[in-house]
Amino acid sequence: QEASDRKYYRIKADNVSYVLADNFDKTDQSANFLYASKILKNSSVNVPEVLAFSEDLRFLLLQDLGDKSLDTDKEFKAEKILEMALEQLSKIYFSDQDVLRSATKESLLIQTNSFIDFCKENKLSNDELKALENLRNNLVQNLLNQQFIPTHNDFERRNLMMFEENLFVIDFQDLNMGPIGIDLASIMYEHSYEYPKVLIDDLLEKHLKNNGLKASSEELKNMIMHALAHRSMRIVGAFNKYFKEGKLLNRKSDLDKFLKRIHLALSTLKKDEAKIVKKLLCCLLYTSDAA
């Protein structure tokens, strides 16, 4: 089950297994999924087959890709997973751009509104809140200056599955034109995995050459760090909102991991606001210990 209230069921007919997605009244998500699926398949991205859907788009019948979600499966080495993931990401880049909506300054700023709410709830001073407000505006400005390409927006291991020795991409309904750093930050600096710097550097160098991207290695790393800070702020804010609604409580332990990702990004970029995030981390850990 997803935070969006979407539910998945595995069903069998004639000894063949399928996945039934129930989107309840969120039929706009179903429409986006179907649209993105067609775009990605046309670009040879491995995505599950859509076999049928109800007239009102509440239900989607999908190909069953099994249970090897790459955020839990330990069979595959990190280097192999990242290489295969970047191969699929390269194919996403070559999706039809003309039919995709584009991220805007407004949409990117909205994504981190809830992070400021989280900071207010954790008793930061007015000066600290003002500094973070300026920071999120600066992050968005950097993102807007990046090369815009087709973007999954949540390109991490839990949205990648291994099926018949091929890596498949799922949950791609938010596909749009976005900053190049977003998907690379998602997969290379995922909250639960610490990859060796030499591996990240090597893979990013190859990724640059293979895709003819308009950046040097250092410029790309800078873009990724700005995207990592923004993405992690978005997720911290979203988690905090879900927790207050009684949703995703099993992921409370991930909150500090995303704060650490914000701190990593800001420290790498030599941003003074890293100290404020460090304070948030200390407050969160103290609260957890007290509980």
Give the residues covered by each predicted segment.
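Active-site acidic catalytic loop and adjacent metal/ATP-binding pocket
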Residues: 6-11, 92, 137-182, 194
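Protein kinase glycine-rich loop
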Residues: 1
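ATP-binding pocket architecture of kinase catalytic cores
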Residues: 9-105
